[in-house]
Swiss-Prot record:
Conditions for induction: Expressed in a circadian manner in the liver with a peak at ZT4.
Protein name per its UniProtKB record: Prospero homeobox protein 1
InterPro entries for the chain: Homeo_prospero_dom, Homeo_prospero_dom_sf, Homeodomain-like_sf, Prospero_homeodomain
Lineage: Eukaryota, Metazoa, Chordata, Craniata, Vertebrata
Renumbered residue ranges of the record's region Disordered: 103-147, 178-221, 320-344, 444-476, 525-547
Region span, Essential for nuclear localization, interaction with RORG, repression of RORG transcriptional activator activity: 723-729
Cross-link Glycyl lysine isopeptide (Lys-Gly) (interchain with G-Cter in SUMO2), sequence positions: 324
Localization (cell): Nucleus
Amino acid sequence: MPDHDSTALLSRQTKRRRVDIGVKRTVGTASAFFAKARATFFSAMNPQGSEQDVEYSVVQHADGEKSNVLRKLLKRANSYEDAMMPFPGATIISQLLKNNMNKNGGTEPSFQASGLSSTGSEVHQEDICSNSSRDSPPECLSPFGRPTMSQFDVDRLCDEHLRAKRARVENIIRGMSHSPSVALRGNENEREMAPQSVSPRESYRENKRKQKLPQQQQQSFQQLVSARKEQKREERRQLKQQLEDMQKQLRQLQEKFYQVYDSTDSENDEDGDLSEDSMRSEILDARAQDSVGRSDNEMCELDPGQFIDRARALIREQEMAENKPKREGSNKERDHGPNSLQPEGKHLAETLKQELNTAMSQVVDTVVKVFSAKPSRQVPQVFPPLQIPQARFAVNGENHNFHTANQRLQCFGDVIIPNPLDTFGSVQMPSSTDQTEALPLVVRKNSSEQSASGPATGGHHQPLHQSPLSATAGFTTPSFRHPFPLPLMAYPFQSPLGAPSGSFSGKDRASPESLDLTRDTTSLRTKMSSHHLSHHPCSPAHPPSTAEGLSLSLIKSECGDLQDMSDISPYSGSAMQEGLSPNHLKKAKLMFFYTRYPSSNMLKTYFSDVKFNRCITSQLIKWFSNFREFYYIQMEKYARQAINDGVTSTEELSITRDCELYRALNMHYNKANDFEVPERFLEVAQITLREFFNAIIAGKDVDPSWKKAIYKVICKLDSEVPEIFKSPNCLQELLHE
């Protein structure tokens, strides 16, 4: 018996292990084995009826095996589902074992000690009793005389066994075919059953199974993120393309706007030019009509060459005016097409041509009339409203120097007497090879003077720049006389439109001397002389002063080629002047040979013929500042040139009257070379040159203020200015000497 019990126990444990690891159990084989064992047991106990019992049990087992299994499966199918619902996340075997422990823990001590052994024996008893419970209940007794289990316990154990097998299959199927929806439902059930926590082993198994669930969710999330990024990238590309298109359209709009704006400006400029030409032609026509009514005796003293020059100027002006509309029309056709010329522009062009032709014919007729008149007969004035200065031809005809002076003044004719037709041109600032001097002071007329000279000017606009020829209106020259009223001579450079009159349209009109002269003279006038003329009419007892005195002596002093005109005195009068003249500029240049840093008191002493004020003083100081600037520039230039030539000592540097530096300085301050430069100036120039040489050799020119030390040395080398410079007629006296 003990051997039989130990063998049965081992078979039960082996069977239980096979159930735990999922090995399929053959029901028929196990039942036959147990049936044989039971038959042997009963035959030993009851030899008489053993054979009958064995046969009966075998038959009973063979007939009822399949029916019992099907019946139990169908009977407990619903109860299995109900039992599985409360434990969705736990292992079925663990739940069954736990239930068995709770149910049998108090009645079977052997089960508490060894759960696996008890369970195995119960299952074995279940198999035995389930086959013979209906026909032979007394036979299902334990060897120890223990009564067999009730039908309910047998059914329960069988149901639990089948439920465990089915749970294994379900777990396998569930692990293989999990979906996101199933995982989501499992998570919800887990949250609902969170209070019913299980053992750590069960939790580990559950977590291990759940770690595999979010893979599909993670993949779908990554796909969603990548799709979203691709969508954003596409939107960004489209926005960038739209921005580029808008920028391109903006550039096109800007180009169109600039084209329209430029075309509008060009049309306005052309219209303005045409209107200006039309106005000028109307003015010329009016002047020509006025000239017809003049008496012939007003031009008895005029130079016939003047009319030839005027005729030539008008011819050139007509040619330029006729060519200008053609050029403008060709430009407009090239830019905007052949039909873009407006009717107004065509009308203005035609009007301009007609007016120019009319004016030209009238001028030619007038010139022919003048030359066809008898010598003793006085011819009418051609252009009295122009108020042209007559410096070229206002000299007395009996003077033997007239023709010579007139010929020598040809190069300065346009400077002293500008063409009235050139007053419409633009003013070009002349350039000179010498250092640019400060522009002379400009003094404009006040309202009282304009009203006083209004009838004489014919109601024309006052010019911005007045003539320097009026500076000598207070001086008299008995050998000259002029037929025109003095108020007309006070403003010889006036133009009807008030434009500046010092224009240069030709390349051969200005030499360096004339350019420098014009720069210093075209913007000068004297208020004192104009005021004097407006209050002192012409009378035989007091002949009016003329403009030739200043202009001719000015040219003589600047150019030095009019020695026969040296007897003309620009300071024959003693009236005070309120402005600076070119003679004052010449005087200041000569004074620079003696003093480089004059004080304001010295200037007032040596320019006694000028009524000083703040502007006059500032202008004189500015002149000397420009003189010094040119002086120092030349010194530095020749000092560096000497260093480049290899000069190493200051003893090798000297200035003589034959050196190039002296000629440059003399040409600037004494252009006519009619003044003898004092020896003291040569000494000062030599000291200055050596100072610059030493400073450059020592490397002091790196400092921006390195010249200040030289200035301090040179300012102490000023010498006394001769007393002759205090006289208003100092230039005449110096030139005579």
